[in-house]
From Swiss-Prot:
Belongs to the DEAD box helicase family. DEAH subfamily. InterPro entries: Helicase/UvrB_N (IPR006935), Helicase_ATP-bd (IPR014001), Helicase_Restrict-Modif_Enz (IPR050742), P-loop_NTPase (IPR027417). Its EC number is 3.6.4.13. Keywords: ATP-binding, Helicase, Hydrolase, Late protein, Nucleotide-binding. It catalyses: ATP + H2O = ADP + phosphate + H(+). A motif (DEAH box) lies at residues 215-218. One of its GO terms (molecular function) is RNA helicase activity. ATP binds at L123, N124, T125, G126, L127, G128, K129, T130. Induction: Expressed in the late phase of the viral replicative cycle. This is Putative ATP-dependent RNA helicase QP509L.
Length: 513
């Protein structure tokens, strides 16, 4: 059977393949289809999403090149589109790598030496995925396209590439660069582009790149972003992710058909000390009742209602003030130090402005940065992004902040709204490799005791326990929006003193009055 290999993958005549496989044809397509899991509280009228690891173009059905071994039993005769790649300048440059990074570089390099090589790197947040990828660029010496989700990450890549490989011509490809038609790999050695721009480019744009690096590869599951895979099949592809299979709906599994199973390295033991300050907040009755949609609690609407409580907003401001003025004299037996900076996480973008206004009244001489606000207004400037590296307080949404954004001087987090998913990535914002390990990491976690979302704290406890962070509990209310009476409820050095658990209490064991 004949097949072609092109940018779209392995192309086989649809009718011939169907005739060859007969009943197995339907089974093949089903195996290459990922169906989203229904989420708790999801309205019934919302269609269940499906994505396929095949695409139809005219008389041909295309599959990821990664699957070509599965077709060997059909004695395929491949006709591959010829690709001519220039070599990048070979200049001996050295930059330090940790042992685990060097081991992974060697493993990836071996895999990507073969034509159409694929590698999906799974490495925890803050452990140097970018540096590993840059080392691969240096070894392969192919024109490289780096695809990133946001401009903030694009700027970080440009900075790292310029620092570590100064002999290469590096450029950022964005909306402004789109107007420059000759901006290709012929003019530059490495181009770093944002997915929202690159996904619109025709397949000819990707032809000169011998290597494509997909940063935050797990995020390419969305219907629009996923289309990029059908344009880069001829290149070697390196996917990077800290959470490759972490989506509640399971849609990130579609990436595996293109990159293979995520490969994880042995990560170093975390050396950051820290603790959690868990505040049990009793909100005003007008704001704590659940919001239901189709007879099910809506987490989004419930959080929105919680943040209408002005006392809860003031509680976050008070905690920011406390962290900002924190000194080594605070009597915790693990010791504390004045934090370099504070990240305040919220669930929705509209809350950024609310908290910014509240914080600005208290911190008149303190630099507060909200990078997403500039993004929403039409693009964040490089100057604004550079300011985040010196800001005392940064406001972010969980969705924006969980990506691979690097703030090495940040050591404290305030979770202004409840959170269940992506907690390891969130904590990774203050535990990045290369940041000051002497600084104690502090997490302020607000538990809304009267809200149905309060049970999410048990999911967060599991992550805190994994990190080895002691948990101190205190209380606050809408009548008293500042925390007090701090009590140690979990000690990693003396687990027998547990006053909290990592699982919710069983309903059958609870006393009813």
């Amino acid at each position: 059977m004949e097949a072609i290999i092109s940018f779209a993958g392995i192309g086989i005549n649809y009718k011939r393949l169907q005739s060859k496989l007969q009943h197995d044809f339907g089974r093949l397509l089903k195996a290459l289809t990922v169906t989203a899991r229904a989420l708790p509280g999801q309205p019934k009228h919302i269609a269940i999403r499906q994505e396929t690891a095949f695409t139809l173009q005219g008389e041909y059905i295309y599959f990821p090149i990664l699957l070509r071994k599965q077709f060997e039993m059909f004695n395929m005769v491949y006709t591959a589109r010829p690709v001519s790649l220039r070599a990048l300048p070979c200049v001996e440059t050295e930059f330090p790598l940790f042992n685990y990074q060097q081991e992974m570089v060697d493993k990836i390099h071996k895999k990507l030496l073969s034509p159409y090589g694929r590698f999906y790197l799974h490495l925890n947040t803050g452990l140097g995925k970018t540096r590993i990828a840059i080392s691969i660029i240096q070894k392969l010496l192919y024109p490289t396209l780096v695809i990133v989700p946001t401009k903030a990450i694009q700027v970080q890549w440009i900075d790292e590439l310029t620092l570590l490989l100064p002999h290469l011509r590096v450029a950022a490809y964005n909306n402004a660069a789109c107007k420059k038609k000759d901006m290709t790999s012929k003019e530059y050695d490495v181009i770093v582009g944002i997915i929202n721009t690159l996904r619109k480019k025709p397949e000819q744009f990707f032809e000169p790149f011998g290597l494509v690096v997909l940063d935050e590869a797990h995020e390419l599951h969305s219907p629009e972003n996923y289309k990029i895979f059908w344009k880069i099949q001829l290149s070697r592809i390196l996917g990077l992710s800290a959470t490759p299979l972490d989506r509640p709906d399971g849609m990130d599994k579609i990436i595996i058909h293109h990159l293979g199973q995520p490969q994880r390295t042995v990560s170093p033991t975390t050396t950051f000390s820290g603790y959690v300050r868990e505040i049990e907040y009793q909100g005003h009755p007008d704001f704590v009742s659940p919001v239901c949609i189709n007879e099910k609690v809506s987490a989004i609407a419930t959080i929105d209602k919680l943040l209408q409580d002005p006392s809860r907003i003031q509680l976050v401001v008070n905690e920011a003030k406390r962290l900002y003025s924190l000194h080594t004299a605070e009597p915790h037996k693990w010791g504390t130090d004045e934090p370099y900076g504070i990240i305040i996480f919220v669930e929705f973008r509209k809350l950024l402005e609310i908290f910014y206004q509240a914080l600005s009244k208290e911190f008149k001489d303190v630099q507060i940065i909200v990078p997403e606000v500039a993004l929403l207004c039409g693009g964040v400037s490089n100057t604004a992004l550079s300011q985040t590296h010196s800001a005392s307080i940064i406001l972010l949404t969980y969705g924006y902040g969980r990506r691979g954004i690097s703030f090495k001087h940040m050591t404290s987090i305030i979770m202004a709204t409840p959170r269940r998913n992506n907690m390891e990535q969130i904590l990774g914002r203050i535990t990045r490799q290369g940041s000051d390990e002497k600084k104690v990491r502090i997490v302020v976690d607000i538990k809304d005791t009267l809200s149905p979302l309060s049970s999410q704290v048990y999911d967060r406890h599991r992550i805190y326990k994994k990190k080895g962070y002691p948990i101190f509990k205190c209380s606050a209310s809408y009548q008293q929006p500042y925390s007090s009476n701090e009590v140690l409820i979990w000690d990693p050095y003396n687990e027998s003193c547990l006053a909290c658990t990592t699982t919710p209490p069983s309903p059958s064991k609870q006393k009813h009055t």
